[in-house]
Amino acid sequence: MLTAVTGINWGDEGKGRVIDLLAEHADVVARYQGGNNAGHTVVTEQGKFILNLLPSGILHPDVVCVLGAGMVIDLDHLAGEMDAIEERGVKVGSENLKLSDKATISMPWHKVQDGLEEDRLAQKGAAFGSTRRGIAYAYSDKYRKKTLRLGDLLHLDEKRVQDRLHMILESKNLELGGCYHQEPMSYDALLEWCRMQAGQFAPYICDVGAFLQQAHDSGKHIVLEAQLGAMRDIDYGIFPFTSSSNTLAAYAPLGAGIPNCRLDHVVGVLKAYSTCVGAGPFAAENAMSEDWNEQLRKAGGEYGAATGRPRRVGPFDCVASRYGLTCQGADKIALTKLDVLSSMKEIPVITGYTLDGVQVPSFDPLSDLDRVKPVVTTLPGWNKDISGCKSWDELPKEAKAYVEFLEKQLGHEIQFVSTGAEREKFVLKGEWL
C-alpha cells in the first residue's frame, strides 16, 4: 500500500504526529521534497523530537526511512540531526536510513547566499521571510544544473565529477563576488568538504528507487511524507510566497523515487485553527483581535519547529482549506490540536471572503488575497479537557458539533481527530487506514 501524508494549508498542520502513528504499521517512510526548512514534531514516551530532515518514521526501529530524489539535503544538518537523536537512544544506521543518489546536495554556499539576499531585501523593507536554510538556492541550482547530487559523492576521484565541481565553483564565485562582494571559495577546500561528506554518508547513499520498487511490489506499506502544505506548493501555492518544491500528493511517488507507482490513499492533515510561518497573504490573522491571536498562539505553542519564529495564527479557514483539499486530492482527513480550543467560550470559523464588499466565490492564489476580508461564523466552545477522551462519543457535544460543522463546510468527512500531542491521544470518527 502506498499512502501520502500531506498538508492542506500552510504547513505545521501536525503531519509528523500523524505519520508517527501510521508508522506503527508501516514498513517504509519516505520524504519526497523539501529540505531542512521545516520541522515535524513528534511526542513519544522519550519526549519531544523535532525532525527537520529525518522522516518521522525514524522513531520506529523496524521502519526503513528514505530521503527521496526530490529533496535538497544539507548534509551538515543531517549529520547533526542524526547525532542528536542517537544520543537519545534512537538507532540510525544504513539499515534503517537510505539516501537517494539522485537527491540534490545543499552546498555550503546556499545558506550563505540565502542569508545575504534576505539581508539585502530587509534593508529595503522587503524581506521575504526566508528560513535562511538555502532551500530556494539549492533548488535553483538544481534546475540550473550547477550543483552536485548525492550520487556524485561516490565518484569524487573521477574526472567528470571534478570538472563539474570546478565549473560549478567558478560560476558560484562569480555570483557571490559580483553581487555580494564575498571572497572566493577555494576548490581544494570544497573538494575536501565533499570528501568528508562522502566518508560519512557513502554507506547510506543508494538507488532508492530500486529499493522502493521492490518494497512496493512485495506488498509493503510505504508512507510518503510531505513537508509544508498546499499553500506553499511552488506551482499551486500563493506565489511567490511559496516554498521551492512541489508539496502536493501528486508529486509524492515521483519525488520519493517510484514515479510509476500510484497512490492508494492520500491523508490530508488540517489543524483545528489556522497557522502560517513566513510572509504572504494570510486572511485568518485579520479575523480576530491581536489579543485573541496571541491567546491562541500561547495555548497552541505556535512557534516554528525549524526557526522558532512565532507563527501567524487565526481561526480555521474553510475557504483556504477547501482549496487545499482539492489540490491534495485527500480521501482521508486528520484534524489535529482540537484540544487547544478547549478553553474558548466561543470559537470563530472563517466561512467566506469578501473583496470590496463583494463575496469572493472561491480561493484564488493569484488574486488579491492580501485585501480580502474574512466572513466569520461563531460556534459555542466547550469548557472541558478532552485530552483523556478515547472515543468520538466521549467528546463534548460542542466539540463534536465543531468538527461536524467543518465537515459540512469542507464537503469531506474527518476520520481522525487528535486530542493531545502524545501518540495515544486521538479519537477515530470514521473508517481510518
Model regions and ranges:
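Non-transmembrane, aqueous-exposed alpha-helical and coiled segments at domain scale
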Residues: M1-L433
